[in-house]
Structure formats: C-alpha cells, structure tokens
Amino acid sequence: MIHDCIKTQMAVKHNDISLFVINEEDISSQLDRAIREMLVVCFPADIEHFQRLSWWRSIAVYRVLGKNDKGSIVSHTALVERNIIVGPALKKMRVVGIQSFCVLPDYRGTGLSNKMMSVVLEEGSRRGFDAGLLFCREQLLKVYGHMGWSKFDASVYITNDKKGKTLMSGFTMFYPLNARQLPTGDIDLAGNDW
C-alpha cells in the first residue's frame, strides 16, 4: 500500500480510483517498488526487467498513476520527453512518449484506461508537447484508436550505440496535442525507443 507521502497534483477520480500525475524525481523508493510490482503483473514476459527497473529504455519525466481506495497502484503510464525529427524538411517536434501504459487485470473493462489516457493527454498538452507518440502491437491498434490515436504509416527510425540508426518494427501511433497534425514523412526518434 502506498500512502499519501508523494508530491502530486490534484487527483482525478474514476470510480474508486484516484488518478494523479507525479514527476519522476518525486517517486520514492517505496513507490518505485509498488510500480515495479504492478508492471510485473501487467507485463509477465518482461518480469526480469521490471523486477529491477520501473522504466523501459528511457527514463520518464513524469507518470500518471491510478491508486485504489486501499492505496495500491492499479494503473500506470510513464511519460518520456523527446525531440524527434519528422519528414524531408527535418521538422523538429517535441513529443511525449507513452511508455508501459497498463491497468491491472481486475480493473480492466471499467473505463479506467480511457480516463487514464485522457489525464495523460491533458497533462501532455498542459506541458506544451506538440504530440503524443506510442508504440504497440497490432492487437492494441484498435484499443488506442478508440482513444483517438492514429496509426502512423511512414517509417520510424531509432538510434542506439550498438546498431546506429535502424528501422523500428511494430506499430507507431500519433495523437495531436499542441500541433494539429504530424508533418508527412519518416520519423527519426533521435535516440532509442522508450
């Protein structure tokens, strides 16, 4: 159970769940452990990774968490800040990357995912991001599509120390925040995925 020992903005309620935004530097070791325990349940194939870390390839700037009335973390999203390069004109855009978006199984089907995503996007807009980007498997395209996300059909490139610049596999989705649309052309993430 996580007590109210964390600095957050005012919580948004969804049924008995309080959704709140917390900056990464305000996450205590106790809260980080609770997040990792939840991620292990939601992403069992990545148990070894999430037993050690509560983020994937890029450290979050902030997170949106859902806490039930008993104080347990039941939903999570980590948000990564990145300046990407889009299209032949090399247009720079500041995006918020959605990482490890998940809800515990007992809380799925209640509308919590939709409410959490709306909090994520409102906060991204408030923080001045041009757009949101997420990466997902094919079976999640429809889920995110119902939340207003659009599939991005051009190529997306990542850069890492081992392989240099490479084409990313999987699906990329876009959500306009302070920019009305994504420029046409390929995306260079200017780093690894998140």
Residue spans of the language-model regions?
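Conserved N-terminal entry element of GNAT/NAT acetyltransferase domains
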Residues: 1-29, 190-191
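Conserved catalytic-core motifs of GNAT/GCN5-like acyltransferases
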Residues: 21, 135, 145, 150-173
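A conserved beta-strand-loop-helix scaffold within acyl/acetyltransferase catalytic domains
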Residues: 22-102
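Acidic/histidine-enriched, beta-strand-rich ligand/metal-binding domains
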Residues: 99, 108, 124-127, 142, ...
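Residue-level recognition of the GNAT/N-acetyltransferase active site
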Residues: 104, 137
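Conserved acetyl-CoA pyrophosphate-binding loop and the N-cap/start of the following alpha-helix
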Residues: 106-119
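Conserved GNAT acetyl-CoA-binding A-motif
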Residues: 122-136
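C-terminal "cap" of GNAT-fold acetyltransferases
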Residues: 158-194
